Amino acid sequence: MIQDLILLKAKGNKLSQENYYEVVDYMIKHGADKLIAKFFIALDSFGMSKEEVYRLALAMRDSGRVLKFNMPLFEKHSTGGVGDPTSIVLIPLIASLGYKIIKMTARSLVFTNGSADRFKAIPHFKVMLTNEEIEHNLNTTNACVISHGGDMCPADRVLYDIMEKYGLEHNLNLLVASIACKKFASGAKIVLVDVKYGDASVIKRYLDALSMAKILKYVFKKNGIKPILTISSTVQTFGDGIGNAIELVDALNVLQGRKCLLRDVSVRFAVEMITTANPTLDRSDAYDMINSNIDNGLAYKKFMEIVSAQGGDTKILQEAKVFKPYRSVNFVADRDGYVGSINSLVLGEIVRRICETSHDDNIGIALRVKIGDFIKKGEILLSFYYKDESDFDNYITAISGCIRITNEKIKEIYPIRKVIR
């Protein structure tokens, strides 16, 4: 049966909704075996229409539990970048404004860490919840963070395995289907997806990010979801930290009032979301409301409520003990000049590689500079937090070459290039 579908695609045919339900049924029964891998390789080779992407997403949604709540829900997703904990800022920020927001976390592809990785740095934080628990949290705290694991979209986890094993992580149609099935299952009605492009992203080119955003717009609208697609560059990391616990600290600092790029981007995302929900709301008023809830502490208080409701240890957050590095070393500038580039791709790969082998959320890198900053010889460029001496020995050379100093100032780049609705 799967072989027949492969032949149909090879002949240029579009597959029906029934065909995609058959594919997903096979995925659930057989996992990521060679035959189903050949099918997805065929999709990669021969292409998919937007309608087919929607059909695959719908079939994967129906492979597991689908949430249905009688309430308007926001959700936010990122296609994956380095040093981007905006979701952790955005969830309590939106909730503090009286809106309801759900976040389905998932493990990330390739070199980035996902929201699931960051939240698990909070001791005892529970993301495997029943429908009743999810609804209760949405009604009491306006927010809920849930896992893509368990019985939510199990077919998508098979697709993840295939994409990683066979190098299909860059296929825009499969990426969209993977994202969309989870948003369909979460019950969200307004979804912001930050589509990233650049060296430190799965998607490398701006035009590919634009194409992906257009496919997302189609499948979301067909499912009755209001889409907000931001296209952003990974040239500059949003936050200063790279690593699970350190990115969590980054987000907490913003929720406690710190002014920085991470705050600017998070506030911009929040503005796009609440003005989509309320088209008559003036954007300047939206900015004022959102910034006020950071500065008056309501967003931070809401974060603690959300963590507490999901069993997380709020004391360790309040005492700033969530990030407990073992050893650290500073990398300094060898001359005066301007920060010309930061290779966050390599830095992200290093941190993830060590985290996966050590199973330690305290591994990380703190960037002390941004692109365009003027620095003097001897100033700290970044700090590397590690556990074993072998980690330092293995990566010192690679890390030391990740920040380039130039004689001329590089023009500051605001990362968000475009917004599509």
Each language-model region and where it sits:
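Active-site-proximal beta-alpha loop/turn segments in soluble metabolic enzymes
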Residues: 40-44, 118-120, 156-165, 194-203, ...
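General beta-strand structural signal in soluble alpha/beta enzymes
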Residues: 75, 101-105, 127-130, 145-148, ...
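Phosphate/diphosphate-binding glycine-rich loops and adjacent basic-rich segments that engage nucleotide
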Residues: 139-189
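Acidic, glycine/proline-rich low-complexity segments that act as flexible tails and inter-domain linkers
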Residues: 1-83, 96, 121-122, 302-309, ...
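Well-ordered secondary-structure scaffolds
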Residues: 4, 9, 14-16, 67, ...
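Glycine/serine-rich anion-binding loops at beta->alpha junctions
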Residues: 72-95, 99-111
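A glycine-rich helix N-cap at a beta->alpha junction
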Residues: 118-144, 214-220, 224
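Alpha-helix C-terminal capping segments
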Residues: 45, 89-101, 182-187, 222-223, ...
